C-alpha cells in the first residue's frame, strides 16, 4: 500500500510538469492500486448489504401504513407526517454529518447509526400511541443520517476509480431493501401484527457487526486515501457555474424524489382504492415497483461510467415523462407495467447525480453525499406530507395526475456542464 501511494505521488509530480490537471492525475493514480486490491469488492458489498438492511427497516415504516391507518384511525395527513418525520430528520442531519466527517472521519459511527435504526424498529413494533410511532420514525431517520454519508465515502474509497459502479452497488442494496420491505410486511407483519416489526431488530444487530468490521477497514485505509486525494481539491469549473449546476441537480433530485414519494407512500392506497385489490396484493405490486427501481440503480452507475453521468441524467429524468403521463389513465395490468418502468428509469438517475456532484466538489465526498441523500429524504418527506393533504381533499387519483408532470423538470439538465471540458 505504501508503495502504491508513493507510486501515485510520483505519477502526480511527473504529470504536473507536463501541464495535466492535478485533480485528474490524482484520480488516475488511485484506481490502479484499488483495482488490484481483492478486499475492495468485499468492502463495497459489505456496505451494500448493510444498506439493504438499513432500507428494509426504512421501508417497513411505509409498508405498514395501510395496517396502522386502520388500527389507529389515521388520516392521510397523519400518514404523510410519519414519512415527513423520518425523512426530514434524516435530511437535516445528513449534510451536517457529511461536512463534519469530511474533516474528521468517524469510521465506527456506521455501527452506531445502525443501532439508532434498531431502536426505531423496536419503538414501531411496541408503540401504543401515534406519538411513539413518530419517535420511532425519527430514530430510523437519525440512523439513516449517520449511515449514508460515511458509507458512501467508504464505497467511493473502495471503488478503484469506478465511481459510478461503486455508487450503484452501494445504492442497489438500499433499493433492494426497499423492494423487499413490502413483501416482508405482506407476509410477516400484516398476518402477525405490529409487534412483528420488532423481529427485524435481529437483522440490525447483524448489520452493526458487519459495519464495525467495515469501520476497522476504513480506519486502516483512510490515512493513505487522504494522502492520495489531498491534492485533488481543485474546482473543475468557475464557482458560479458549479453553484448553478448544484442547483439544477437539486431541482432534478426534487422532481425524482417527490414523484417516488408519491409511489412509495400512496401507491398501495391508489391500487386498493382504484382497482379494489387486497392489502397483500397491493404490497406485491409495490414490490414490483421497488424491485424495478433496484434494477435501475444497478444500471445507472455503470452507464454513467460508460457514457457520462450527464447523459444518464438526461435520459432518466426526462425520459420517464411519457410513462408518468400515461399512468393515471390505464388499467391494473398496465399500472403494474408502467410503474415498474417508471421505477427503473427514475432510479437510474440517482447514482449519476451523486457522482456528478462529487466531481463538481472534489474532496467533499461526505458533504455531497449528505446533502443529496439528505435532500432526497427531505424532499420525499415534504412531498409525502403535502401530497397526503392533497389526497385527503381531492383524492389519490388527483395526486398522480399532478405528479405526472414533475419529470418535465428534466429539461433543466441542459444547464449542467460537460465534465469533459473540465479535463482539457
PLM regions with names:
Residues 136-173:
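Cytoplasmic helix-loop-helix junction between adjacent transmembrane helices
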Residues 59, 87-95, 178-179, 290-298, ...:
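Residue-level signature of mid-helix packing/kink "hotspots" within the transmembrane helices
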Residues 73, 105, 126-131, 160, ...:
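Helix-breaking motifs and short loop linkers at transmembrane-helix boundaries and internal kinks
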Residues 304-353:
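C-terminal transmembrane helical hairpin of 12-TM major facilitator-type secondary transporters
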Residues 61-62, 244-294:
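Extracytoplasmic gate region of multi-pass secondary transporters
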Residues 170-219:
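Helix-loop-helix hairpin linking two adjacent transmembrane segments in secondary transporters
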Amino acid at each position: 500500500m505504501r508503495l502504491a501511494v508513493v507510486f501515485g505521488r510520483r505519477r502526480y509530480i511527473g504529470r504536473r510538469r507536463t501541464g495535466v490537471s492535478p485533480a485528474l492525475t490524482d484520480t488516475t493514480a488511485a484506481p490502479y492500486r484499488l483495482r488490484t486490491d481483492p478486499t475492495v469488492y468485499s468492502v463495497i458489498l459489505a456496505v451494500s448489504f448493510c444498506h439493504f438492511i438499513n432500507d428494509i427497516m426504512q421501508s417497513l415504516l411505509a409498508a405498514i401504513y395501510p395496517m396502522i391507518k386502520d388500527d389507529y384511525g389515521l388520516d392521510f395527513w397523519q400518514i404523510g407526517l410519519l414519512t415527513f418525520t423520518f425523512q426530514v430528520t434524516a435530511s437535516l442531519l445528513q449534510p451536517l454529518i457529511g461536512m463534519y466527517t469530511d474533516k474528521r472521519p468517524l469510521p465506527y459511527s456506521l455501527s452506531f447509526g445502525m443501532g439508532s435504526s434498531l431502536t426505531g424498529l423496536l419503538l414501531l413494533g411496541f408503540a401504543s400511541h401515534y406519538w411513539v410511532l413518530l419517535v420511532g420514525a425519527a430514530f430510523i431517520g437519525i440512523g439513516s443520517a449517520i449511515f449514508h454519508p460515511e458509507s458512501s465515502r467508504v464505497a467511493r474509497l473502495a471503488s478503484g476509480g469506478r465511481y459510478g459502479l461503486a455508487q450503484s452497488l452501494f445504492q442497489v442494496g438500499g433499493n433492494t431493501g426497499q423492494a423487499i420491505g413490502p413483501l416482508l410486511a405482506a407476509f410477516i407483519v400484516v398476518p402477525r401484527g405490529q409487534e412483528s416489526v420488532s423481529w427485524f431488530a435481529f437483522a440490525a444487530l447483524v448489520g452493526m457487526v458487519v459495519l464495525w468490521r467495515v469501520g476497522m477497514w476504513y480506519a486502516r485505509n483512510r490515512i493513505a486515501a487522504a494522502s492520495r486525494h489531498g491534492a485533488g481539491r481543485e474546482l473543475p469549473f468557475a464557482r458560479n457555474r458549479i453553484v448553478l449546476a448544484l442547483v439544477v441537480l437539486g431541482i432534478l433530485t426534487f422532481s425524482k424524489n417527490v414523484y417516488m414519494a408519491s409511489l412509495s407512500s400512496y401507491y398501495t392506497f391508489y391500487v386498493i382504492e382504484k382497482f379494489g385489490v387486497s392489502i397483500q396484493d397491493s404490497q406485491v405490486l409495490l414490490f414490483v415497483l421497488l424491485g424495478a427501481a433496484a434494477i435501475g440503480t444497478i444500471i445507472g452507475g455503470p452507464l454513467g461510467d460508460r457514457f457520462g453521468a450527464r447523459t444518464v441524467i438526461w435520459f432518466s429524468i426526462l425520459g420517464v415523462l411519457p410513462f408518468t403521463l400515461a399512468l393515471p389513465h390505464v388499467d391494473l395490468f398496465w399500472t403494474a407495467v408502467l410503474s415498474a418502468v417508471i421505477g427503473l428509469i427514475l432510479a437510474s438517475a440517482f447514482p449519476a447525480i451523486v457522482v456528478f456532484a462529487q466531481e463538481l466538489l472534489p474532496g467533499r465526498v461526505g458533504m455531497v453525499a449528505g446533502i443529496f441523500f439528505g435532500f432526497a429524504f427531505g424532499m420525499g418527506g415534504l412531498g409525502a406530507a403535502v401530497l397526503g393533504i392533497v389526497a385527503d381533499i381531492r383524492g389519490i387519483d388527483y395526486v398522480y395526475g399532478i405528479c405526472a408532470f414533475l419529470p418535465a423538470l428534466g429539461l433543466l439538465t441542459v444547464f449542467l456542464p460537460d465534465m469533459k471540458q473540465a479535463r482539457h
